[in-house]
Amino acid sequence: MPTINQLIRKGRKSKGSKSNSPALNFGYNSYKKVQTNNSAPQKRGVATRVGTMTPKKPNSALRKYARVRLSNLIEVTAYIPGIGHNLQEHSVVLIRGGRVKDLPGVRYHIVRGALDTAGVEGRMQSRSKYGAKKPKK
């Protein structure tokens, strides 16, 4: 424990906050082949693997996920929200931050209705979150 004099001389260092979605904090310069510090709200990527995984206890389901290689060459696991999807390997997807509490290691969501990802069919409520168009009357 520091003395009062030590605290007067040095002071306390505040801890820097850690990002919950670190892959969105980097860009990539393909000419120089270096990472850049350009952060982005979403990033484009290519699905390298699409599958299902089981959640932590006490939940039980088959949650859909995709392994995505981003445009900054970082590979992340992203959750596919909604019922049913059309993603395959090599689909181009848009990811955003946001973890899935019962899937360890999944810190990103795929944006439905953007790029190759179709919106959820027949969805009437919370349509904007799932890329569903307004139904015709």
Curated annotation (Swiss-Prot):
One of its GO terms (cellular component) is small ribosomal subunit. GO terms for molecular function: rRNA binding; structural constituent of ribosome; tRNA binding. Residues 32-41 have a biased composition (Polar residues). GO terms for biological process: translation. Disulfide bonds: none annotated. The keyword Repeat does not apply. Residues 1-57 are annotated as: Disordered. The modification 3-methylthioaspartic acid is found at D102. Keywords: Methylation, Ribonucleoprotein, Ribosomal protein, RNA-binding, rRNA-binding, tRNA-binding. The keyword tRNA-binding applies. HAMAP family: Ribosomal_uS12_B. Part of the 30S ribosomal subunit. Contacts proteins S8 and S17. May interact with IF1 in the 30S initiation complex. Belongs to the universal ribosomal protein uS12 family. With S4 and S5 plays an important role in translational accuracy. Interacts with and stabilizes bases of the 16S rRNA that are involved in tRNA selection in the A site and with the mRNA backbone. Located at the interface of the 30S and 50S subunits, it traverses the body of the 30S subunit contacting proteins on the other side and probably holding the rRNA structure together. The combined cluster of proteins S8, S12 and S17 appears to hold together the shoulder and platform of the 30S subunit. This is Small ribosomal subunit protein uS12. It comes from Ligilactobacillus salivarius (strain UCC118) (Lactobacillus salivarius). The lineage of its organism: Bacteria, Bacillati, Bacillota, Bacilli, Lactobacillales.
